[in-house]
Amino acid sequence: KTRAELKYDAKALFKGRWKDAILLNLIPTILSIVVTLLIAAVVISLSDNADTTLRNWLDNVMFSDEGTGNGTSNVGSGILSTLFTVGISFTFLDWFRNPKMEINPLKNGLQVFTKKYFLRVLLIYILTSIFTTLWSLLLIIPGIIKSYAYSQAYLIYKDQSSSISNENISSLDCITESKNLMKGHKWRLFILDLSFLGWDILAVLSLGIGFIWLMPYKNATKVAFYQDLINNN
């Protein structure tokens, strides 16, 4: 399918049910708004007329690695953000396949934190992070390419966990399958991501409020991309 068709599928899914989609994405949306506001605060604080004390405090909070465990905090926030997003993607995948399904925003959005998914999803995150970092040591471009190659591993795991015993699912196999599935499609997904850039900028300019609608739209479109991949393989 074309980018326009994938985006249409996402919007069609939400027709009459935008409230469900927004509530499902509430936690990562709030995080995005907070980050946007913090960035805005930093920009303001660095202006010539900003208060020096505020500027120094924001510099320490946002950029300092000393004493506060900022590096560890960044890793932790990255893991949490991924877990929330994956749980939402799992729900969208079920929703695409059963458009009339009832959405429980809290239960569905946090499903990755259950025994069925948590450890395997976390392991996929750790492995893909390690692999991407190692490739990035060569040059940044190989790291970006590999991140796209690994991008479908979570949804592949979701499908496999529904068909066979959890104990038999290998996180590494899901990553390998993602690489195979993405052969010839990495650039396509990159362009799909790029097509949202204008909306991302508008969302930031609205101090993050636009993410309330944009986050569900982007997440659902990426799930539609995965569904299209497996339909054609």
Map each language-model feature to its residues.
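Hydrophobic alpha-helical membrane segments
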Residues: 1-233
